[in-house]
């Protein structure tokens, strides 16, 4: 059969049939337009309802926030003693909160003991460190660990961390682990006991000297961090870094990862944020650390940081920034307000392991 014959067989045999076919096509087109119009109306209605609901949700949230603030104000006013400020009443409240119990408390006491030894080691060798984040909050607000916190956070200048690593290399009591974390593209540094059965550790975060404490300028480092993560993701040579997101700095191939971080650090100098100590007007959260997108990039003036002060933490005297209040407000806002992460705080050590087995036994004998 020719193409012409095939086309003829597919066409209506009469004008009437052709006309009927045309009417059918018009009807189908009309139905299609009606369906399209219906979808448009549905989308417009859905958008209108969404906008209306969003406005109502925002209004409800504002009302709840206002009510929450009013109730807190009323509660604190009734809680405070005569001639006691609201802030002092809040601190008194936090310091009277029950301590953690069981394995969690053993871990905290073990970390406090380790921190005391770390403090002595740093003082003996002229190294500067200071409490940051939850550890600083605990020192100022609780006089020790926040009851639901299970890790210890300390900040150090890059050169002091490098010296510390050398010192610990000749000290059989302790060890330092340097691990690259692919999940959050960071360099994780921890100070621990040489005994691997003791799970206590101190997280060490790197700070660099900065031209100024200008946070808008420091935000440029966030872009460099994004570039770092993308470069690592696209580096086919790093295919070995996959089964486990944690890769030790001393392992084979780590020099390739290290080179990416060093290149990013050089860019932080080239862009005019990081500088030498002699030219510094502040300090800045280094690109080696993890990046929290919910907060501005941390930068502090020299006056807010140095000279370091001393504060008590679980009976141990530790270093805190010169202006701890400025540090805490930059991280938490009103840090004396009631927290929202009591039950959702991330567990750095398995709490099940703390209640049984070799870990529990090691902590019990160690913390006593």
Show which residues each predicted segment covers.
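Active-site nucleotide-donor binding segment shared across nucleotidyl transfer reactions
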Residues: 119-152
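Conserved catalytic core of two-metal-ion nucleotidyltransferases
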Residues: 99-123, 165-223, 232-333, 338-368
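Flexible coil/loop interruptions and hinge/linker segments embedded within long fibrous stalks
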Residues: 3-49, 56, 60
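Helical scaffold of the NTase/Pol beta-like nucleotidyltransferase catalytic core
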Residues: 50-65, 69-131
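Catalytic metal-binding acidic patch
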Residues: 143-164, 315
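Beta-sheet entry/capping signal
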Residues: 128-129, 153, 310, 317
């Amino acid at each position: 059969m020719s193409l012409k014959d095939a086309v003829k067989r597919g066409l209506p045999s009469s004008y009437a049939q052709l006309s009927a076919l045309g009417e059918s096509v018009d009807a189908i087109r009309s139905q299609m337009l009606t369906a399209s119009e219906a979808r448009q109306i549905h989308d417009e209605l859905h958008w209108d309802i969404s906008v209306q609901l969003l406005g109502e949700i925002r209004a409800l949230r504002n009302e709840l926030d206002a009510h929450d603030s009013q109730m807190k104000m009323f509660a604190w006013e009734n809680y405070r003693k005569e001639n006691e400020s609201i802030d002092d009443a809040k601190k008194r409240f936090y310091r009277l909160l029950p301590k953690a119990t069981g394995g969690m408390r053993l871990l905290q006491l073990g970390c406090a003991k380790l921190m005391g030894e770390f403090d002595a080691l740093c003082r003996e060798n002229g190294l500067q460190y200071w409490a940051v984040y939850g550890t600083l909050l605990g020192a100022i607000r609780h006089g020790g660990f926040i009851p639901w916190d299970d890790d210890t956070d300390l900040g150090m200048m890059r050169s002091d961390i490098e010296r510390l690593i050398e010192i610990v290399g000749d000290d059989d009591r302790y060890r330092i682990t340097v691990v690259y974390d692919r999940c959050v593209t960071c360099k994780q540094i921890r100070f621990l006991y040489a005994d691997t059965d003791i799970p206590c550790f101190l997280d060490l975060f790197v700070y660099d000297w900065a031209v100024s404490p200008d946070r808008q300028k420091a935000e440029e480092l966030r872009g460099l961090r994004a570039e770092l993560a993308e470069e690592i993701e696209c580096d086919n040579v790093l295919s070995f870094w996959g089964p486990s997101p944690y890769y030790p700095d001393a392992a084979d191939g780590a020099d390739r990862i290290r080179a990416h971080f060093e290149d990013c650090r050089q860019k932080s100098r080239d862009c005019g944020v990081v500088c030498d100590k002699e030219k510094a007007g502040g300090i800045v959260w280094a690109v080696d650390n993890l990046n929290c997108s919910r907060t501005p990039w941390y930068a502090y003036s020299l006056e807010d940081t140095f000279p370091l002060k001393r504060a008590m933490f679980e009976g141990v005297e530790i270093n805190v920034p010169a202006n701890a209040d400025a540090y805490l407000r930059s991280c938490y806002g009103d840090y004396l307000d009631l927290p929202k992460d009591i039950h959702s705080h991330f567990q750095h050590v398995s709490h099940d392991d703390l209640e049984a087995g070799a870990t529990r036994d090691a902590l019990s004998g160690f913390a006593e």
